[in-house]
């Protein structure tokens, strides 16, 4: 049986890479501009795990597209994606890095 210390060492740290975290891309299509305040509030809540974000206004179609790159544990990514998915007037999809790749 692993000691408490060696369990956390093996689970979270190996060769300078934090384990248990994954990279994910969250794509958001905003059809209702009034949802922007709620989206920004949620993104601010999870700002510690956001690597970067890019917003593109697509005026010809009347939508905005937001791409958010995150580096966090699965449950954090799912919580963020779930909260965003509950906002009216937007569509959210999340793409995860394969488990074990560079982790």
Located regions from the model:
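Long, contiguous binding/interaction regions
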Residues: 7-103
